[in-house]
């Protein structure tokens, strides 16, 4: 696995002004590959190691979709921990701009450790990064990843499997609910190692009467063949 400094350097090389523009315009941004093929394979390999996880969810049981996901236990794998720590500061700067635009009273700490301290004071102490796995016919219903009162406005998904090689179908879906209008959808098909950064719950949207709160949900379209793995990185912890 790479060092934390290596992951931080890769993230620092991303075009953050372009990411910020895309997040403001559409509520999401897709990056070039951040993880290598071997790193993706190593993360997929962790899925069978039950000692790495605090919880396993059969999605069909709860009518969340068809598939399975597992929440990592503490301590997180070094790559996941490094990614979570390094991605947070630039996203916190954007998140605070969003909060100001929406005229909330929320200011997110500049570091992940600061956010997690806020979470822990509110009873949210469980790590939320997770691995998700779908086989042919699997899908994920539209949802939001909320685990308590503390909600960081942005999260990311890393795509570990090779599209058109390991699986087909399985687009990443985003739907924005607009006031007094029909919902707007996006279908995104990232390659292995790429990330999608997206709104967790709300985003500021410029409307005819000023800024309004656009509600966002995300999901996964049906996998038509093969096996699809992703890494989800949520920054707030869970109750």
For every predicted segment, state its role:
Residues 1-155, 160-239:
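Fe(II)/2-oxoglutarate oxygenase catalytic core
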């Amino acid at each position: 696995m790479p060092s934390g400094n290596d992951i931080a350097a890769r993230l620092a090389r991303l075009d953050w002004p372009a990411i910020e523009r895309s997040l403001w315009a559409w509520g999401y941004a897709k990056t070039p590959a951040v993880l290598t093929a071997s790193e993706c394979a190593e993360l997929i390999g962790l899925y069978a190691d039950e000692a790495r996880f605090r919880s396993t969810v059969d999605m069909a049981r709860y009518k969340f979709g068809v598939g399975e996901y597992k929440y990592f236990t503490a301590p997180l794998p070094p790559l996941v921990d490094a990614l979570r720590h390094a991605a947070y500061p630039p996203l916190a700067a954007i998140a605070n701009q969003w909060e100001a635009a929406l005229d909330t009273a929320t200011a997110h700490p500049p570091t992940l450790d600061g956010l997690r301290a806020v979470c822990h004071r509110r009873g949210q102490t469980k790590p939320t990064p997770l691995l998700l796995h779908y086989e042919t016919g699997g899908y994920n219903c539209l949802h939001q990843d909320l685990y308590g009162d503390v909600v960081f406005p942005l999260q990311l998904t890393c795509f570990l499997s090779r599209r058109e090689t390991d699986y087909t179908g399985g687009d990443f879906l985003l739907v924005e609910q607009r006031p007094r209008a029909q919902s707007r959808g996006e279908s995104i098909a990232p390659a292995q190692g790429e990330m999608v950064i997206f709104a967790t719950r709300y985003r500021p949207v410029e409307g005819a009467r000023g800024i309004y709160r656009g509600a966002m949900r995300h999901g996964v379209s049906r996998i038509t063949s093969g096996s699809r793995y992703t890494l989800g990185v949520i920054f707030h912890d869970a109750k």
